């Protein structure tokens, strides 16, 4: 009898505890290091703010590894509720209609207040459909800017950052005359020197609104503007005005060591530069070619967004919607922006950061935001939506490296890259049209 009573008590306690157990939500991400620790902190803050849901962040490696893991997990029916996908994977995610739960629909179905107009249009446009409905939630967005070594500039008698590429050339020559080895280097050469070059000058990178209007898009980055720019950079590589440093952000080392006085890199690189630079540095907007455009357009974003995957319970999705609302709060976004250097995704987060005096205390951190919100995005500046974009970027990297080495002229290199890239687009079209 005693054992029966004990058993009933144990069962009762188990039922009670299960009734109060928080619904778990798995979030796969690609944020390593300090940013990864911050992601854990954000999830914990949400978990501590309520008792219904528990978000469990899981680091899955770099962007490519995280996306690949999510695809494999979905096929095995073991997918997370949320996955962070970099911007070049957007077209692939959109094409996987049976795999994704569009954010705008999720928020509506879950009864969460959701106003797309509060987000920065230059950011949300990248992740919205043709009706302007957000398919994924922007999380860590960035845009390229120009960092420059103020100490080396002062030594060379230069008092301000170059605004145009013509000025970059003249400034670099003055720097070299003062003893600096190289004028500038770049990170992410395809993203900065072709994709954003095109947007900055309101020139198409691909047809059909850079892929936004359909999968039959074709690449056009072998046009006169792009060819002239890459040809000039090839000349600069020969005389030291430009120094190639690799396909990712390896150029940071040359900037830190003061080998190169200027560095085109993501706005999100600010925190790392501030931590590693032993000199006074400034941040300026990405240069443009004077005479090629009357007024430079907005640049386009890099980084990643959060996609919600199908195959979970209604209760889990209510939790996901609640978590995404939490991440969009001005205080949360402002803190993430100020910590990481990524752009604030809402106007409220931007305004709060300004009110808190962050931009005044950290000159240059507002540059990316100002540059991204220059005018209204056009068909050429709202972003890129290309299938097999990871492979296309690899093709572009090979083409640019052949120019830097002097093996091929810019026109031939870009023509070849367009031809090879279009073959990738046709494969994607065949699989998804």
Locate the predicted segments by residue:
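Extracytoplasmic "Venus flytrap"/periplasmic binding protein-like
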Residues: 41, 45-119, 151-163, 254, ...
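Extracytoplasmic/periplasmic substrate-recognition and gating elements
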Residues: 48-49, 76, 132, 156, ...
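A structural signal for short loop-to-beta-strand junctions that line the ligand-binding cleft
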Residues: 72, 80-81, 112-152, 182, ...
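Hinge/lid segment of periplasmic solute-binding proteins
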Residues: 86-143, 163, 169, 195-199, ...
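Short, solvent-exposed loop/beta-turn-alpha elements that line the ligand-binding surface or hinge
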Residues: 104-119, 203-228, 275-276, 288-298, ...
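C-terminal capping/gating helix-and-loop segments adjacent to ligand/active sites or protein-protein/ligand interfaces
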Residues: 129, 299-300, 364-420
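Extracytoplasmic/periplasmic solute-binding protein
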Residues: 130-139, 144, 169-218, 260
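Glycine-centered hinge/linker elements that transmit conformational signals in sensory
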Residues: 172-178, 214-245
């Amino acid at each position: 009898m005693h054992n029966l009573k004990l058993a009933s008590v144990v069962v009762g306690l188990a039922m009670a505890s299960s009734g109060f157990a928080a619904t778990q939500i798995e979030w796969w991400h690609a944020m390593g290091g300090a940013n990864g620790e911050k992601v854990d902190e954000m999830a914990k803050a949400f978990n501590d703010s309520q008792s219904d849901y528990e978000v469990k962040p899981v680091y899955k490696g770099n962007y490519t590894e995280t996306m690949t893991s999510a695809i494999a997990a979905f096929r095995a029916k073991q997918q997370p509720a949320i996955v962070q996908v970099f911007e070049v994977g957007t077209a692939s995610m959109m094409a996987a209609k049976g795999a994704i739960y569009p954010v705008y629909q999720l928020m509506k179905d879950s009864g969460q207040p959701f106003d797309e107009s509060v987000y920065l249009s230059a950011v949300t446009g990248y992740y919205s459909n043709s009706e302007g409905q957000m398919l994924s939630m922007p999380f860590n967005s960035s845009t390229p800017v120009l960092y420059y070594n103020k100490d080396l500039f002062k030594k060379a008698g230069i008092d301000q950052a170059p605004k145009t590429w013509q000025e970059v050339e003249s400034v670099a020559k003055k720097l070299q005359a003062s003893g600096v080895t190289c004028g500038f280097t770049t990170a992410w050469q395809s993203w900065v020197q072709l994709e954003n070059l095109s947007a900055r000058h309101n020139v198409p990178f691909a047809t059909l609104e850079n892929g936004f209007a359909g999968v039959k898009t074709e690449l056009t980055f072998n046009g006169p503007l792009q060819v002239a720019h890459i040809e000039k950079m090839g000349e600069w590589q020969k005389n030291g005005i430009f120094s190639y440093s690799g396909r990712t952000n390896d150029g940071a080392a040359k900037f830190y060591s003061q080998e190169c006085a200027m560095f085109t890199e993501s706005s999100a690189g600010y925190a790392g530069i501030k931590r590693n630079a032993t000199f006074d540095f400034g941040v300026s907007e990405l240069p443009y070619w004077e005479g090629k455009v009357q007024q430079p357009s907005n640049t386009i974003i890099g980084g990643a967004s959060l996609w919600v995957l199908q195959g979970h319970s209604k209760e889990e999705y209510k939790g996901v919607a609640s978590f995404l609302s939490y991440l969009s709060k001005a205080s949360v976004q402002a803190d993430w922006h100020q910590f990481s250097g990524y752009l604030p995704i809402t106007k409220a987060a931007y305004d709060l950061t300004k009110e808190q005096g962050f931009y005044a205390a950290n000159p240059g951190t507002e540059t990316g935001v100002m540059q991204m919100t220059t005018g209204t995005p056009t068909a050429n500046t709202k972003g890129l939506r290309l299938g097999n974009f990871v492979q296309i970027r690899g093709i572009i990297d090979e083409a640019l490296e052949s120019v830097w080495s002097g093996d091929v002229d810019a026109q031939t290199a870009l023509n070849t890259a367009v031809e090879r890239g279009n073959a990738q687009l046709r494969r994607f079209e065949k699989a998804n049209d």
